[in-house]
Regions:
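Catalytic-core regions of hydrolytic enzymes
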Residues: 1-87
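Stable alpha-helical elements in mature extracytoplasmic
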Residues: 4, 34-41, 84-88, 92, ...
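A structural motif corresponding to the C-terminal end of an alpha-helix
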Residues: 4-12, 95, 99-100, 130-139
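Acidic, glycine-rich loop-and-strand cores that form catalytic or ligand-binding grooves
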Residues: 79-80, 84-115
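Active-site-adjacent mobile loop/cap segments within catalytic or ligand-binding domains
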Residues: 55, 59-61, 109-177
Length: 177
């Protein structure tokens, strides 16, 4: 994320806000995975009038799982946010795939509510809290799962040095711009 920020800030008029730099919630309340922390990050993006919200992650599963995924908003409720998110997700994944990160059945994805949560118009809501919350605030959000930290090959090829991390960050930035 920090390398992406550095690359984005080379462009005039681009302001990047980082909502965390450690595993603790910068807004209090414990883990960054907590509902409260996610809500506060979404609120922060609204308060700074963000144009986009990008959530950086590494996936984890069994040792054979590989590949890149970028989640974006569904087309329900505020479909323009979904369309903008889809364009952004496709641009980012194109750059990451160009680095050699496989898709292996992943790619650009929508994840809908698994417990029938609905938007105000009655349509099925997005599952991911930062995507759903930012949609309410008219901010396209994507969540990037760069590769699998649980896969030795992914770790060696894409995560094993600062230069490799920088390459990921530059690819993310180029997809965003």
């Amino acid at each position: 994320a920090s390398y992406c920020k550095q690359e984005l800030e080379k462009h005039d008029g681009v302001k990047v806000y980082m909502v965390r730099d450690s595993y603790s919630c910068p807004f209090g309340g414990g883990s960054v995975k907590s509902t409260e922390c996610n809500s506060k990050r979404v609120e922060f993006s609204k308060n700074v009038k963000a144009d986009l919200y990008i959530s950086f992650h590494l996936n984890s599963s069994g040792p054979s799982a590989r590949g890149v995924s970028v989640y974006y908003p569904n087309m329900n409720y505020k479909s323009e946010i979904g369309r903008n998110g889809e364009v952004l997700a496709k641009d980012i994944i194109k750059r990451l795939k160009a680095l050699g990160i496989p898709q292996q059945g992943r790619g650009t994805l929508i994840r809908n509510s698994e417990n029938n949560t609905r938007y105000p118009d009655g349509s099925l809501a997005d599952y991911l809290a930062v995507i759903k919350g930012n949609k309410y605030n008219n901010i396209p959000a994507v969540l990037i799962e760069h590769c699998f930290i649980s896969n030795a090959s992914d770790c060696e090829q894409f995560l094993s040095s600062e230069e490799k991390l920088r390459t990921l960050g530059v690819a993310d930035a180029n997809g965003i711009m």
